[in-house]
Amino acid sequence: MAMVACGLSVLLAAAAAEEYPHAFPRAGTKQLFDNERVTAWEVHWLKDTPQPIHRHRFDMAGVYLRYGPIRVTSPEGVVSPDRPPFEVPRPYFQKKGVTHREEAIGFSPDAPERMAVMFDVKDKIVDPIVPPEGMARAFPRDGANKAIDNDRVTEWDYTWKVGQIVPTHQHDKDSVQVFFQGGSIKFTAANGKVETKTFNFGDARFIPRGTIDSEEAITGSPRAITIELK
């Protein structure tokens, strides 16, 4: 009888855990785009706004664009210790299954509001493309810093400089890109087509694997975190 009761308790606990909503959407979030590889979210930890306990049902990759203090609480009510401020942009990765509440409640009115762009990384796995002979991959490249590398993603921090051309390359993996500093970049495709795009702080985009181009900053010093999906 005791074993039956114990088993029932385990099942009830598992069922309760399954009832937690996914981390997104919630107050302060906006979906940017969605495809077979990722769902992109702009996330603001709104001040003095209660949030539900939620469960991250996907691996999550992203980048914090602005620091702000938050309080993290487990389903059991345990509050994590406050952490010191961090520099931005801050690349981030978290495995699925994390369950908690994140709130910016009880801090100074002058405290900044945390902001990030986060990606739910879906379970679909896609093999990388082998670039044509003699053609470089998009990453690594000169000046790019590898911030995170694991079995799901590689995250690169890179700043374009005016007049400095990134030679023709192929994105061998599907990638997402989040801009921390804005500016305009000229892209020259394999067929010679030229397109100039202007990016602002917080902009995010998806780059399909197989994309071939060269890049050159035209204005500003665009800086972005590029997340290659494995």
Q: For each of these PLM feature ranges, what is it?
A:
Residues 2-13:
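Bacterial N-terminal signal peptides
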Residues 15-22:
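Cleaved targeting-peptide boundary
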Residues 25-53, 57-65, 138-168, 172-177:
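A short glycine-rich, His/Asp/Glu-containing loop-to-beta-strand
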Residues 34, 76-97, 193-209:
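Short acidic-glycine-tyrosine-enriched beta hairpin
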Residues 51-56, 81-83, 103-105, 158, ...:
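Short histidine-centered beta-strand/loop micro-motifs
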Residues 57-76, 172-191:
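Glycine- and acidic-residue-biased ligand/ion/polar-headgroup-sensing regions
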Residues 96-122, 182, 208-230:
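Ligand-binding loop in jelly-roll beta-barrel domains
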Residues 106, 113-151:
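Surface-exposed beta-loop interaction hotspot
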